[in-house]
C-alpha cells in the first residue's frame, strides 16, 4: 500500500499544473456518482482522495490534478469521497454561520468538469462521525475500497 501526501512544499511545483487547468485528459467522460461507500463497486487500481471539497478551490484543483496524474501513470481510476450534509452541519447544528460555496449539484458538476471518474457522496451522520480516523483509513479506505494510492492535502 502506498500513500502520497501533497504537502505545502509541493504546492509550488504543482502551481504550473493548476495554471494549465485540468489538463490531464480524462479517459472516461462520464462521472459515476455513488450515494454511499457501500454502493461503490471496486474498480481497477483506485487512486483516492477525500474531503468536503466545497467550492473546488485552488488547493482542491492541485490535489485533483495530482490525483489524475497518478491515475494516468498507474493505469488507475480516480475516486473522490465527499460527504453530505457537510460535517459541520451535523456536528454543530445550531451554528448557522456556515455558508457553503456550492450546492451538491454544483459540486458534482465541478468535479465532473475536473475529470473525476468516481464520486462517492457518503451520508455524514452523528453515527458516522464517531468513526475514528484510524477506522476510516483501515476499515473503509484500505479494506473496503481497496485503494492503490491515497492523495491528500497537507492539512488533512
Regions found by a protein language model. Name each.
Residues 2-156:
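Nucleotidyltransferase catalytic core that binds NTPs
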